[in-house]
């Protein structure tokens, strides 16, 4: 959950998000080292006089060719690893289909019979005390903790985007096309997201709420919801 005046990431709740936070820190340290080197060279040029031997030296040309290549490799390797992990969907325990509409989400649990529902934002006038304005919904997405979840995402009208920052998930919902993503929640909790593609007048009013629970609670919830439907 984001906090007021927060500058960093939300607490990671999935392995992918943990990797993304680590890669951000890694890239930030590389950028800091580059900036420090450039500032040092600028200060050196202001203090000391440059000789023609220094400017024309082949060693300098060799260094500023090899050094950027090493920096790019240090950034590319972990980035490619994370991209591969984000695209890898191997034997999910649960498949969820999310369909974007103006301006709400529909969900289908494809592993269950008749387990579907629409998820609307709760208006401020009906919001219970202690709940978050513009983020709460009438039906949450409930998933079992520490289980691979595949999410198939599409839209029924215009472009949308299904995004939950603390899980490291953001996938476009495109009419007539099926996109997919996956995640594993590492702890129980309630994780908030929103549509991240401008989709009309009420774009700001279609939040996403994912609730991670132990498997026994998820089984009880799914049985109860299947009976009600």
Swiss-Prot record:
Organism: Struthio camelus (Common ostrich)
Subcellular location, principal: mitochondrion
Amino acids binding Cu cation A1: 160, 195, 199, 206
Class of the enzyme per the UniProt entry, highest EC level: translocase
This enzyme's EC code(s): 7.1.1.9
UniProt name for this protein: Cytochrome c oxidase subunit 2
Family to which the UniProt record says this protein belongs: Belongs to the cytochrome c oxidase subunit 2 family.
List of residues binding Mg(2+): 197
Chain residues that bind Cu cation A2: 195, 197, 199, 203
Keywords: Copper, Electron transport, Magnesium, Membrane, Metal-binding, Mitochondrion, Mitochondrion inner membrane, Respiratory chain, Translocase, Transmembrane, Transmembrane helix, Transport
